[in-house]
């Protein structure tokens, strides 16, 4: 599983790779070892060498998000958008940063932009659902987006988790419980799903807003 919806760069660059490609590979390897701060330091020279690298800016955005540096993450994602406006990963990453910055209208807009660019990818529909849930609005649209993600990839536990939260937001507790149980059957060790199910069962205190940090960033997806 990848750390989010950006395609991971190769950890070992091919022979003849540019200095920027070497930097991206090194930063990717460090990120995979859960050292985003060191990965940023490895990636900065790569971006200085090739500031037109979309993959480098996307990776930088992911690293900044992992470090809770949301404004720099947004700036990196915007660089990628400017370089490759047709690539859905950049607006989806920007959407995540915007949600964390509390800029919910912009987050929803960017999430839908990713869907428009690549409507067959469930990750973007999941991002729409999360943008709306985080904004605490348009719960029917969030539920529809989560259901669409499940339809596109019924084998990904995270999408059932998202669907469960959307159903809960709509007040459909029994359906939400079933969605969370489905998610946990597929991925029993997801603490976020465990907690939300406990909340529905009256065994834990409800959080003020849905969160998915700490277990799945953007919804992990098998690549």
Regions inferred by a protein language model and the residue ranges of each:
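Structural signature of tandem alpha-helical TPR/SEL1-like repeats
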Residues: 32-45, 66-79, 100-113, 135-148, ...
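Alpha-helical segment of the N-proximal tetratricopeptide repeat
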Residues: 16-55, 59-66
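Canonical tetratricopeptide repeat
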Residues: 59, 93, 127-128, 162, ...
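Helix-start (N-cap) detector for alpha-helical repeat units in TPR-like alpha-solenoids
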Residues: 20, 54-55, 88-89, 122-123, ...
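Terminal, low-structured helical/coil segments at or just beyond the last alpha-helical repeat
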Residues: 2-11, 185-223
